Amino acid sequence: MGKLFGTDGIRGIVGENLTADLAFRVGQAIAVVLQEEKGSRPTVVIGKDTRISSDMLESALMAGICDMGGDVKPVGTIPTPAVAYLSRQERADAGIVISASHNPYEHNGIKVFSGQGYKLSDAVEARIEERILSDAPMKHRTRGEIGRRHHGMRQLKRDYIDFVASTIESDLAGLKILADCANGAAYHIAPDVYHELGATAVSYTHLRAHETLANLV
């Protein structure tokens, strides 16, 4: 285990040991290492939870990746498994989830998947961490070498909803369901999944996104 990466990525209290500056540096390092691995411009899928700090960290990560010539596909607020699935489906070089799971809202984290949707190898993770902690400046890209943010990613959420629904064989027609979305990242995925499975009478608790009450993601 490294100085930054724990068993579940980089985690900390936002504004203390997890800052926008660090997230920018993490984005830079990920793009550089992926480019070394691939030999060409990398693409990264990014998702996040509902925490108040997730937007800020997402922006910093995307800026760092683009600064080093990587492209990003932000899919917005979405459950962690969705990023693993979409990274593989989109043939991306990596996926990033901004989340600290069940931890209190002041915490957040940066979890990185491989392009196959699995945990990064220890070797690649170590190279990324070495870049982050190095005092050597990274060479900024210029002109056409700068990375881009892809737009129109709403369809990717739809793809994940369809995938989840396809894995459930039960017909929910006529069932009354109570779903607790815990103010988390599934808050706008769950209703569509239940609808596709035929449920017509569904009640939700903690459905809306809540920046300081994200319980489970």
Question: Could you describe each region identified by the protein language model?
Answer:
Residues 13, 108-208:
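Gly/Ser/Thr-enriched, mixed-charge loops and adjacent short helices
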Residues 31, 38-116:
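Ferredoxin-reductase
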Residues 6-7, 100, 178, 210:
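Alpha-helical architecture
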Residues 206-217:
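Single conserved hydrophobic/aromatic residue that forms the stacking wall/gate
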Residues 56, 82, 188-189, 215:
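Phosphate- and divalent-cation-binding pockets in alpha/beta enzyme and binding domains
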Residues 49, 180, 211:
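Acidic active-site catalytic centers that drive phospho-/nucleotidyl reactions
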Residues 1-63, 67-68, 153-177:
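An N-terminal, well-structured beta->alpha segment
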